């Protein structure tokens, strides 16, 4: 079966595993997904991720607070294959007045909304995470 939106599939797998309080989730590997996961780890939304050498799946360790509360409260795919959403550096939205993060695909790689504004680069708004 052909997957039309692999990023949405990854976000859905993370959302579903997060709601069920799973510690790990497997997603098919790609370079774009690895870049997105690196940003999520840097921003503190996931604990860790790794790609075993003999596997084509990324293992993502989800993060929870000490009292078992979810760190990721919500995930939303913004730009989709049928309707791409682009924004200039000035137009990149703030998620929940800065409490969340917008992932932006730019010429400098995958950046958060704040990093894109600082670098004065726009791009495709991939997703919101809060």
UniProtKB/Swiss-Prot annotation:
One of its GO terms (cellular component) is ribonucleoprotein complex. Pfam families: Ribosomal_S8. Keywords: Ribonucleoprotein, Ribosomal protein, RNA-binding, rRNA-binding. One of its GO terms (molecular function) is rRNA binding. One of its GO terms (biological process) is translation. It comes from the Bacteria. NCBIfam families: PRK00136.1. One of the primary rRNA binding proteins, it binds directly to 16S rRNA central domain where it helps coordinate assembly of the platform of the 30S subunit. Belongs to the universal ribosomal protein uS8 family. PANTHER family: 40S RIBOSOMAL PROTEIN S15A (PTHR11758). Part of the 30S ribosomal subunit. Contacts proteins S5 and S12. This is Small ribosomal subunit protein uS8. It comes from Aster yellows witches'-broom phytoplasma (strain AYWB). The gene is rpsH.
